[in-house]
Amino acid sequence: MSSNNSNQDNFIRFALEAKVLSFGEFKTKAGRLSPYFFNAGEFNDGAHLSALGRYYSKALQESKLQFDMLYGPAYKGITLAAATAIALVDDGINVPYAYNRKEAKDHGEGGVLVGASVKGRVVIIDDVISAGTSVGESVDLIRKAGAEPAAVLIALDRMERSGNAVDIGDKSAVQAVEQEFGLPVISIANLAGLMSFLTASSDTQLTNYLPAVKAYREKYGI
């Protein structure tokens, strides 16, 4: 489930301007040569983080999902959950958020979870889903706390089948998460939206990458 076309196009434009989204030839962890690269770590100042939170907030509200709080898995998800919580307040929605530590503390407040008490319907927020491992860990922590995962909210759905350059799976990481955990995955943007954006662009530097992106999707996409 992706955001509406207007929000998606604006987000892609924003990611390009911030150099979070770039085109070229990039080797993925799976060993595939991708014509594009998305690095949310480049949203690294106050202005970008504030805008990013608004995109997450809008995608979440457009989904009409019923939720009680936000959860950010360490490490990237921590900042994303906080930024989204702040952005939601601008629309009159004040919800708590929490996150986890990579290692439990045995002093002070102790434990693995930090922030608000984890309860009710919880939205897990991250940048992308690569293998679903982080989602599985988050689901376990949330359920052990007595709460219920409601959805996963990400910035970009690559719409790419799992596996490597040779062995290609039959479904994407997002589809695997939806199937395994029974959770909807909401994305601000996805590969189909990116291709539509490139097709409609008047910038020849961008449209020149469209054939490579199209070929990549035909080979690895869902």
Swiss-Prot record:
CC cofactor: Mg(2+)
Disulphide bond pairs: none
Any one GO molecular-function label of the UniProt entry: magnesium ion binding
GO BP annotations listed: 'de novo' pyrimidine nucleobase biosynthetic process; 'de novo' UMP biosynthetic process; pyrimidine ribonucleoside biosynthetic process
Any matching Pfam family: Pribosyltran
Catalytic activity: orotidine 5'-phosphate + diphosphate = orotate + 5-phospho-alpha-D-ribose 1-diphosphate
InterPro entries: OPRT, Or_phspho_trans_dom, PRibTrfase_dom, PRTase-like
Regions that span the bilayer: none
Alphabetical list of Gene3D superfamilies matching this protein: 3.40.50.2020
GO CC term (a single one): cytoplasm
Record EC number: 2.4.2.10
Assigned keywords, A-Z: Glycosyltransferase, Magnesium, Pyrimidine biosynthesis, Transferase
Positions with a binding annotation for orotate: F37, F38, S130, R158
Domain of life (superkingdom): Bacteria
Listed pathway(s): Pyrimidine metabolism; UMP biosynthesis via de novo pathway; UMP from orotate: step 1/2
Keyword Transferase: yes
Residues noted as binding 5-phospho-alpha-D-ribose 1-diphosphate in the record, renumbered to the chain: 29, 75-76, 101-102, 105, 107, 126-134
Enzyme class, spelled out: transferase
Similarity comment: family membership: Belongs to the purine/pyrimidine phosphoribosyltransferase family. PyrE subfamily.
Assembly and binders: Homodimer.
Functional description taken from the UniProt entry: Catalyzes the transfer of a ribosyl phosphate group from 5-phosphoribose 1-diphosphate to orotate, leading to the formation of orotidine monophosphate (OMP).
Record's protein name: Orotate phosphoribosyltransferase
Organism: Polynucleobacter necessarius subsp. necessarius (strain STIR1)
The gene coding this protein: pyrE
